[in-house]
C-alpha cells in the first residue's frame, strides 16, 4: 500500500482525538522525520488544550459554587478606561450559560487585539445577557473617576436583559441590593469577569478608533487616550478637546496655564 504524504498525515492528525485511534497507531509506526515531527506537534497541542481546560475550570470556580447553590444569572462586571486622559470609562456586565467554554479566555489586557475581537464575537453569540455602561469625560470631571466607574457598572447591570441573582465584580463594591463578591484581579480569576473585560475593552477601543478618525492629529486609535508621549505632544500642539478629562493631570495643569 502506498504511504500517505506528509500533508495527508497532517490532515489526518487533525481528525484524531486520542492515542487509541488505530490511525494514530499507524502514524506512530511511520519512521519518516516529517511524520514524527507532526506527532510531536499533536502531543504539544493536546497538552496545551488540557492546560487551557484546567485554567478555564479554575476560572469557573466562583460561578460553579454559585450554581451549586441554585443560582443561574451570575453577572461578571469589569471596567476599561479609568486611567486615560481622554474618552469615556466603559463597563460591561456579562451573564454566561453553564456550558460556555472559550479556550484561552483571560484578562483582556493580556490578549492580542485579534483574539479579543474573536472572543468578543463568541461572547456576544453565546452569552445569556450583556449590558454595557458608558460614562463621558464630562461626567467623569463632575463626579470623579471612581464614582463614574461605579455609575457605569450600575448602568451595565441595569442594561442587562435579565435581572442578575449575583454579581462578581473586579475589585469594586456596588451600592445595590443584589448580592455580590468583589474579586481582586477578577479578570484573571473569573470567566464572567474576564468576558466582561473583553466586551468593555473592545467596545471602548472601537469608540477611541472612531475618535481617531474624527481627530487624526491626536492618534487616539493608537494610544486609546492614555498619556503617551505622542498624545501629550499632540495636546501641546493642537490643544485640549472636549473629549479630554479636564480634571486629570496634566490636562488640568495645561488649562490653568
Curated annotation (Swiss-Prot):
A Gene Ontology molecular function term of the record: manganese ion binding
Q: Which residues form the RNase H type-2 domain?
A: 72-257
> What biological-process terms (Gene Ontology) are attached?
DNA replication, removal of RNA primer; mismatch repair
Family assignment from sequence similarity: Belongs to the RNase HII family.
Protein name stated in the entry: Ribonuclease HII
GO cellular component labels:
cytoplasm; ribonuclease H2 complex
Q: Show the catalytic activity.
A: Endonucleolytic cleavage to 5'-phosphomonoester
Q: Which Pfam families match?
A: RNase_HII
Q: Where does a divalent metal cation bind?
A: 78-79, 170
What role does it play?
A: Endonuclease that specifically degrades the RNA of RNA-DNA hybrids.
The prosthetic group or cofactor this protein requires is: Mn(2+); Mg(2+)
Recorded name of the encoding gene: rnhB
Per UniProt, the cofactor note for this protein states: Manganese or magnesium. Binds 1 divalent metal ion per monomer in the absence of substrate. May bind a second metal ion after substrate binding.
For this protein, the Enzyme Commission number is: 3.1.26.4
Amino acid at each position: 500500500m502506498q504511504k500517505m504524504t506528509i500533508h495527508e498525515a497532517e490532515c489526518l492528525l487533525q481528525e484524531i482525538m486520542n492515542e487509541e485511534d488505530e490511525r494514530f497507531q499507524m502514524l506512530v509506526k511511520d519512521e519518516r522525520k516529517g511524520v514524527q515531527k507532526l506527532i510531536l506537534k499533536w502531543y504539544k497541542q493536546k497538552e496545551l488544550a488540557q492546560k487551557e481546560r484546567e485554567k478555564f475550570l479554575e476560572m469557573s470556580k466562583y460561578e460553579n459554587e454559585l450554581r451549586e447553590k441554585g443560582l443561574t444569572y451570575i453577572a461578571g462586571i469589569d471596567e476599561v478606561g479609568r486611567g486615560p486622559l481622554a474618552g469615556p470609562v466603559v463597563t460591561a456586565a456579562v451573564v454566561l450559560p453553564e456550558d460556555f467554554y472559550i479556550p484561552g479566555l483571560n484578562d483582556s489586557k493580556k490578549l492580542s487585539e485579534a483574539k479579543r475581537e474573536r472572543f468578543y464575537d463568541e461572547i456576544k453569540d453565546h452569552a445569556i445577557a450583556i449590558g454595557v455602561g458608558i460614562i463621558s469625560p464630562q461626567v467623569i470631571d463632575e463626579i470623579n473617576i471612581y464614582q463614574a466607574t461605579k455609575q457605569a457598572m450600575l448602568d451595565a447591570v441595569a442594561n442587562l436583559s435579565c435581572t442578575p441573582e449575583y454579581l462578581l465584580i473586579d475589585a469594586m463594591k456596588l451600592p445595590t441590593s443584589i448580592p455580590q463578591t468583589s474579586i481582586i484581579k477578577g479578570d484573571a480569576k473569573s470567566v464572567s469577569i474576564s468576558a466582561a473585560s473583553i466586551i468593555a475593552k473592545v467596545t471602548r477601543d472601537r469608540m477611541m478608533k472612531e475618535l481617531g478618525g474624527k481627530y487624526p492629529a491626536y492618534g487616539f486609535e493608537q494610544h486609546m487616550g492614555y498619556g503617551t508621549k505622542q498624545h501629550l505632544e499632540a495636546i501641546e500642539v493642537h490643544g485640549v478637546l472636549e473629549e479630554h478629562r479636564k480634571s486629570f493631570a496634566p490636562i488640568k495643569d495645561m488649562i490653568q496655564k
